[in-house]
Amino acid sequence: MVRALTFDVGNTLILASPRFWLLPLLEARGLRPRGDVRKAALEAFRFYEENHLKARDLETALGLWREFHRRLLVGMGLEDHAEALSRELVARWKDPATWPLVPGAEATLKALRAKGYPLAVVSNWDATLPEILEVVGLGRYFDHLSVSAVSGYAKPDPRLFREALEALGV
């Protein structure tokens, strides 16, 4: 018997690949990556993963995202635009267009909610996640958010999962 369900966010609920949120912005500005986008993204996400636990408050988290975007843009060969675009991207952090949803994510959560399942997020993310989930319209579906930077430990640490399960009464 299923008693509760947990979800990750990146590439489960929100599309995390730069091709969904960064490349359209660059195209709109007439900019084309000159470097290896995939390699730049892997390195930027590695930087984020290594530093996100420090981002327990919004100011620190937004600084982390600014540096993430700057590194990503530099890695893509867009050094001349990296500072300005990284500031712009961080300024848009509450814009739902910045966080495109995985197709079917909201419908799935809605259906699970309608069936009465307790739902939680368990994600390696920073302090921005609760507000991001609200602006994209997904926050209302969750009974609990276990966010690594807020909790102080990251997956695969079982404490993050345990926190969610205890909050759901499982």
What are these model-predicted stretches?
Residues L13-I14, L129, A154:
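Catalytic P-loop NTPase motifs of RecA-like helicase/translocase cores
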Residues M1, A114-Y117, A167-V170:
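Glycine-rich phosphate-binding loop signature in dinucleotide/nucleotide-binding domains
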Residues E83-V136, F142, S146-S148:
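Substrate-recognition element of Asp-dependent hydrolases with the DxDx(T/V) motif
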Residues V2-P103:
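N-terminal helical cap/lid subdomain that shapes the substrate entry/recognition surface
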Residues V150-G152:
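Histidine-bearing beta->alpha loop at or near hydrolase active sites
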Residues L73, L133, L165:
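ABC transporter ATPase nucleotide-binding domain signature
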Residues A154-V170:
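Conserved Lys-Pro-Asp/Glu-containing loop-to-beta segment of HAD-superfamily phosphomonoesterases
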